[in-house]
Amino acid sequence: AALCLPKDKDVLIITKENTDECDSMLAQGGVCVLKDVNDFKCYFEDTMKAGHWENDPDSVRVMIESSQEVIGTLIDLGVDFDTDKDGKYDYTREGAHRRNRILHHKDETGKEITDTLLDIAKKKENITIVPKTTMIDFIEKDNVCQGIVCEDEYGEMGSILARDIILATGGLGGLFLNSTNYPHITGDSFALAIKHGVELKDINYIQIHPTTLYSKKNGRRFLISESVRGEGAILLNENGERFTDELQPRDVVTNAIVEEMKKFGTDHVYITLPTMTTEQAAKRFPNIFDACMEEGYDITKDKVPVTPAQHYMMGGIKTDLYGRTSMAHLYAAGET
C-alpha cells in the first residue's frame, strides 16, 4: 500500500518487531494467479468450494480478475518467480486447486516478495519505517479514526495522528500453543476493533494447517508447505498406509489426519516425497529439505513426522472491496 501512494504523501510504517519478523516472510508455497480467461470458472469454483461457499463471491471475483495485474506489478518491481527449463513461469498446484496456477520462488515465496518490496520502501524518501513499536489503541471520535497510540521497545508511549490508518497486523497465531506464526502475532487489531465497535466477520474461522514438522516442544511450528504435496508428497499413517487425498482443502486434510491420530493413539502422521530425488527436492524446497535433514530425515526417502498446527486467520475485520472498515478513515488489509 505504501508503494502505491503518491510521493507527496508522508507514510509511516510501524512494526511490532523487526521488519523481517513477520508472517509474510514465512510464506512458502506461492501465489495463485489466473493463467488465462478460460480458467476463471474453474478457479472461482475451486475457491468457493474450499470456503464451503461462504466466501463473498464479489471478493473472490475481484481477487481472481485482478491477480494477473498484481503479479505483473510484482514482477515489474523485481520479484523473481521460478521458471521451467524453457524459461516459462513454473506453475505448481496446492490443495483445493484442480489446476496448476500457483507461481512460486522455491519454497520461500513470501520472503522473496516481502524482501523486494521492503528494499524499495526503504529507499523512498516519503516512507519511514519504525520497528519494535506496538499499537495499543486507536484514537477515534464519533467513529472517525484519527490515529493510534503506540508503545516502543523501551516502554515509552506516544500518539501518532494521521488522516488514514491501514491495519496490516496479521492474524493471532501467537495466542496458540502451537502455530506456524511468530509469537508476537497476537490479534492486536481484533482486540482494538472489539473495544471500539469496529465490525468483525467470521472471527471464529481459524485455519489449522495439516502439515507442520513434528516436535515435542511448544511454540512456533515449521511449516511443510502444501506445495510439497502439490509436487507429489503423500501422507501415511502409523501403519505406513495412505489415508486421504492430499490435495483436498486444508480443513478436510487436517480432519483426516486427526482421525488417523485418534485411531492409532499418536500425535503425528508422516509425509514423504517419493516423486523427487534428493537433489530435486533440495533445489525445489531448499528450506524445507534442510529443516527435515536437521531432524535426521531425507523427505524423499524417509517418513517425516508431521502434525497439524494453527496457521491462518480466515475471518477478521470486515471490509468492503476497497479495504474500508466500519470506522471512517480506518482500513484493514491482508490477514487482518
Model-derived features with residue positions:
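Glycine-rich FAD pyrophosphate-binding loop
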Residues: 6-31, 35
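Glycine-/small-residue-rich beta->alpha transition segments that form the dinucleotide
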Residues: 17, 162-164, 168-173, 297, ...
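An anion/pyrophosphate-binding glycine-rich loop and adjacent beta-alpha core
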Residues: 19, 192, 198-305
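Glycine-rich active-site loop/strand segments that organize a redox cofactor
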Residues: 32-63
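Conserved redox-cofactor binding core of oxidoreductases
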Residues: 76-156, 161, 168, 212-215, ...
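A glycine-rich dinucleotide-binding beta-alpha-beta segment and adjacent secondary-structure elements
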Residues: 130-131, 136-145, 150-151, 284-336
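Short hydrophobic core segments
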Residues: 148, 159-170, 193, 240, ...
